[in-house]
Amino acid sequence: AWVLSHRGHAVANGLPVLSCNRVGHEASPLASDKHVGASGIDFWGNSHVLGPQGEFIAQAGSDPTVLVCEVDLQRSEQVRRIWPFLRDRRIDAYGDLLRRYID
């Protein structure tokens, strides 16, 4: 779900998305308390860079990695012309819609 939501954000905004995640186990400060039973959390890594159409430009694995890649910022302009998601926004209607919840 983590990667899928990032891909959706890239497509909806027509922008690259860079996502970082740690790797390894981080012990809980409560791990020493036998009554709590919290051992900690496992981080799976898989940091990634997505292009403006949600495609993978670079992806790290589950080992500690320095991920370096080039991102073509001009491509966002091209993609936004092909997929003009934001073109059909009705910003002028936002005030009336929000007033229902504010009042």
Q: Model regions: which residues?
A:
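A structural signal for well-ordered alpha-helical scaffolds and beta->alpha junctions
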Residues: W2-V3, D72, R90, L98
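A short, polar/charged loop-to-alpha-helix boundary motif
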Residues: P64-I82
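Cysteine/selenocysteine-centered motifs that mediate thiol-based redox chemistry or coordinate metal-sulfur cofactors
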Residues: E77-D103
